[in-house]
């Protein structure tokens, strides 16, 4: 409550706050803040064609313009095609979308219930448990993986590598990893972000330069 719509746009993509980044990154590693990097989204929210929209509609508009085509639809397409599957997204059918776009906010979310009008329409055909189930994505179980011994050792090796020392305070990385393994915190997304960077860096810079 009270959070600016600009901050809400960042949402779950906000993995490290600026203070945390300062703690794990070495001084020579600099870059724009999350707010600076996402300034184009803020500008989109304030642009004339979105000026009359409510906050929720602004967020939906940015999601439709960026998150769907640039992230979630790409992942669904790549992963399904890699397994010879053809995936469809019925809620993005043009007629369904046009109808949903004209609905008032109260028909979309009511008392914390998402897809309210849709759930209401199918309630007599579905079991109550199914109809009232919270929205679920398709998350990869990285939280579990990173607590397994083989994964823990692999990540430890990467977090203490010469490449990691070039960019990060490795003792801070190990603290994140150990706190996660000991179930003191869920640092899975923070660990995963650094891990994927190090694998990418090794593949395209370290390995290629040998």
What is the meaning of each model-derived region?
Residues 1-210:
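Adenosyl-5′-phosphate
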């Amino acid at each position: 409550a009270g959070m600016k719509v600009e901050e809400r746009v960042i949402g779950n993509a906000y993995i490290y706050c600026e203070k945390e980044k300062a703690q794990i990154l070495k001084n020579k590693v600099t870059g724009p803040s999350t707010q600076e990097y996402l300034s184009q989204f803020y500008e989109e929210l304030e642009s004339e064609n979105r000026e009359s929209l409510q906050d929720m509609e602004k967020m939906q508009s940015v999601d439709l313009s960026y998150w769907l085509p640039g992230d979630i639809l790409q992942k669904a397409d790549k992963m399904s095609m890699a397994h010879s599957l053809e995936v469809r997204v019925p809620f993005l059918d043009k007629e369904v979308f046009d109808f949903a776009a004209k609905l008032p906010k109260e028909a979309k979310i009511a008392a914390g219930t998402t897809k309210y009008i849709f759930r209401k329409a199918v309630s007599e055909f579905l079991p109550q448990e199914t109809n009232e189930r919270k929205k679920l994505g398709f998350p990869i179980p990285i939280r579990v993986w990173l607590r397994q011994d083989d994964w823990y050792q692999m990540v430890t090796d990467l977090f203490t590598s010469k490449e990691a020392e070039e960019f990060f305070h490795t003792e801070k990385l190990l603290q994140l990893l150990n706190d996660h393994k000991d179930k003191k915190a869920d640092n899975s997304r923070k660990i995963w972000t650094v891990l994927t960077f190090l694998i990418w860096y090794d593949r395209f810079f370290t390995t290629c330069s040998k």
